[in-house]
Regions:
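Catalytic tyrosine of NAD(P)H-dependent dehydrogenase/reductases that use a Tyr as the general acid/base
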Residues: 4, 40
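A short helix-coil junction within the Rossmann-fold of NAD(P)-dependent oxidoreductases
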Residues: 9-18
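Residue(s) in the substrate-gating loop at a strand-loop-helix junction
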Residues: 27
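SDR active-site lid
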Residues: 57-119, 131
Length: 147
């Protein structure tokens, strides 16, 4: 994918300089199954796993290059307005999410999860069996489709 290729291209140059930071943008969706939106959830999971793998490689190489993953919930964007996308969680302000991401990235945080409701959702996903998370996700997506 283009995401993978661009990350690797920039990473190669950063590693040569032993300096730099990559901020990959995923989603809370990257931590859970997503029936009825499988492709979206899978692409976000890919970004999470790619970033986790690169992070481990950088650690083993003792590189000073940093990588972070932004994993927000719904973010208010013009795309959502035009596409008439509806969410179950409150949409976060895009500028606030961006500022938060930069602040946490500069602090060296790896997983960047803005918003208490999204942090709670991520914690719940860790605790619950995947089969239950999948059923909950299905119901949430099904309700969105019916709106």
């Amino acid at each position: 994918t283009a995401y993978h290729i661009l990350t690797k291209l920039y990473l190669t140059e950063m590693k040569k300089k032993n300096s730099g930071t990559i901020l990959n943008v995923a989603s809370i969706a990257g931590f859970m199954p997503g029936p009825l939106m499988a492709t979206y959830y899978a692409t976000k999971a890919y970004i999470v796993r790619l970033s986790e793998s690169i992070r481990e490689e950088l650690k083993k190489e003792k590189s000073k290059v940093q990588i972070s993953i932004l994993c927000p919930g719904p973010v208010a964007t013009n795309f959502n307005k035009v596409a008439n996308v509806k969410f179950h969680l409150r949409e976060a302000d895009s500028k606030k999410v961006a500022k938060y991401a930069i602040k946490k990235m500069e602090q060296g945080k790896f997983y960047i999860v803005p918003g208490i409701d999204v942090k709670i959702a991520r914690f719940g996903v860790k605790l619950l069996p995947t089969s239950l998370v999948s059923k909950i996700s299905y119901k949430m997506q099904e309700r969105k489709i019916k709106k």
